[in-house]
Amino acid sequence: MAKRGGKRTVGVPYRFHVTPGIFMNSLVPVADNSGAKLVRVIGVVGHYSKTVHRRIPGAGVGDMVVVVVKEGKPELRRQIFRGIVVRQRRPYRRPDGTWVAFEDNAVVIVTPEGDPKGSEIHGPVAMEATLRWPTIANLASIVV
């Protein structure tokens, strides 16, 4: 029997299927003013990679990832945070049939509950991320 329900997540319980575009050990720029400039992805929240041997966890737009700051303010460097993927270069298909691809990858640093650490987001934000994380939608200036 398949397991049903019971697992609580942060954000909305559903998500659109988005082709993963950011994987473990990816260096990704930060799209907010939290003080971090470049982060390395060290985990994907909710991804269970022990079911298939040697499968590398991947994250798409709207997924929460675990990151470590590589460049930025000295007090933030080498610290572990959570982040939300708001842009990815890899094209993904929306339910209406359109294909979306951004010119860069980007994450927004958040608390474990999903609240952004910064007060503004630079550049466009994918619609899938704003639907799943309403607090990010409040800070986004451009939603694509």
UniProtKB/Swiss-Prot annotation:
Superkingdom as given in the UniProt entry: Archaea
**What Pfam families does this protein map onto?**
Ribosomal_L14
The record's listing under InterPro entries reads: Ribosomal_uL14 (IPR000218), Ribosomal_uL14_arc (IPR019971), Ribosomal_uL14_CS (IPR019972), Ribosomal_uL14_sf (IPR036853)
| Coiled-coil ranges per UniProt | none
Q: Name any GO cellular component annotation.
A: cytosolic large ribosomal subunit
Keywords from the named record: Ribonucleoprotein, Ribosomal protein, RNA-binding, rRNA-binding
Q: Its Gene Ontology molecular function terms?
A: large ribosomal subunit rRNA binding; structural constituent of ribosome
Q: What CDD domains does the record tag this protein with? A: Ribosomal_uL14 (cd00337)
Q: Provide one Gene Ontology biological process annotation.
A: translation
Q: What does this protein do?
A: Binds to 23S rRNA. Forms part of two intersubunit bridges in the 70S ribosome.
| Annotated NCBIfam families | PRK08571.1, uL14_arch
Spell out the HAMAP family in the cross-references: Ribosomal_uL14
Task: Please state which protein family the record places this protein in.
Answer: Belongs to the universal ribosomal protein uL14 family.
Q: How does it assemble?
A: Part of the 50S ribosomal subunit. Forms a cluster with proteins L3 and L24e, part of which may contact the 16S rRNA in 2 intersubunit bridges.
Question: PANTHER family recorded for this chain?
Answer: 50S/60S RIBOSOMAL PROTEIN L14/L23 (PTHR11761), LARGE RIBOSOMAL SUBUNIT PROTEIN UL14 (PTHR11761:SF8)
What this protein is called in its record is Large ribosomal subunit protein uL14
> Can you name the source organism?
Pyrobaculum arsenaticum (strain DSM 13514 / JCM 11321 / PZ6)
